[in-house]
Amino acid sequence: MSAAQPLDHVLRHNTWATVTLLEFCAALDPVTLEMSAVGTYGTLHGTLQHLVGAEQWYLQLLTGDLLGRPRIRRTDSHPLTELAMTASLTGARVLEVVATDDVTRRIEMNEGRRSTVGVILAQLVHHGNEHRAQATTILGANGIEPPPVSGWGYGRATGISEAEE
């Protein structure tokens, strides 16, 4: 891995953690993917699909581009392998945005609302952490040890840290 700006690692972790969780869950049986837990978004599959679809939307706000067709929505069920591919593509494109865009640039969103590139990036990371935590809660509440998707797990998996949980 080449030298990176600090925000690059935050965004790379975001993508890595989502893809790692999707790949882990792709090996689970369909019944497990329909499990949920109190206080979470919904089913395990639905939570992961919502997470990836939202990241598509954040990228579309930032660039006008839609990666992965069609846009992943709550109403259609998408295979976890497709979600992982879309998450990877979206994450790579977000890194390009960070390298070239102005974080103070204002973006028209919807219903006349505006935000900056920086705030949209902050929301992308927050939203990802929130729903990955919900997905790992669903797994744990149903007796399944989730994969380690923390920052420490990212560091170990990429060989840039030896820190433990």
Feature-to-residue mapping (PLM):
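Short, contiguous pre-domain boundary segments
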Residues: 1-3, 70
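Active-site rim elements
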Residues: 4-10, 80-81
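Long hydrophobic alpha-helices with heptad-repeat/coiled-coil character
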Residues: 7, 105-106
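Short, contiguous alpha-helical
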Residues: 8-71, 111-165
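Helix-adjacent hinge/juxtasegments
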Residues: 60, 64-104
